[in-house]
């Protein structure tokens, strides 16, 4: 192998690692809320997280919970706009992976901070009404 193709190969590999679409792959997939019957689908390629099931509010299916998802310098952290249900609006949030199967949204409002944990699931189970 000559030097030029090796340099080209290294450049291509570096570019692939730096692509935004690959940056959030660790977040991609289905997540269940820590205490509520709510499931979301995190889609790093679109920078969004969509509600795919909500047993208490089925009318919210399809609602964007996460928008503007972006990587940060930390390998296990991202920033995004997250819908804060109690406030009824999107707020800037930090999203972290505390483990491979645990995701945490942290929203700060003034001096207050609230964190919500999500657990990774392989699929979204059918809703009780669908069974």
Positions of PLM-derived features:
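Bacterial N-terminal signal peptides that target proteins for export
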Residues: 1-9
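Gram-negative bacterial Sec-dependent N-terminal signal peptides
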Residues: 10-16
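N-terminal signal peptide c-region/cleavage motif recognized by signal peptidases
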Residues: 18-20
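Central antiparallel beta-sheet cores of small beta-barrel/beta-sandwich binding domains
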Residues: 25-92, 123
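Non-cytosolic beta-sheet module surface loops
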Residues: 32-33, 107-109
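Ligand-binding face of N-terminal immunoglobulin V-set domains in extracellular IgSF glycoproteins
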Residues: 103
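Edge beta-strand at a domain terminus
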Residues: 109-131
């Amino acid at each position: 192998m000559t030097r030029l193709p090796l340099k080209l190969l290294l450049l291509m590999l570096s570019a692939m690692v730096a692509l935004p679409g690959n940056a959030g792959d660790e977040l991609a997939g289905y997540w269940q809320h820590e205490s509520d019957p709510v499931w979301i689908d995190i889609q790093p390629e679109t920078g969004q997280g969509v509600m795919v099931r909500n047993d208490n509010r089925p009318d919210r299916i399809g609602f964007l919970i996460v928008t503007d998802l972006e990587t940060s310098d930390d390998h296990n952290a991202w920033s995004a706009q997250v819908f804060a249900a109690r406030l009824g609006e999107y707020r800037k949030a930090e999203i972290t992976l505390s483990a491979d199967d645990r995701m945490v949204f942290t929203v700060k409002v003034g001096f207050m901070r609230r964190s919500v944990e999500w657990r990774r699931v392989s699929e979204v189970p059918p809703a009780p009404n669908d069974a």
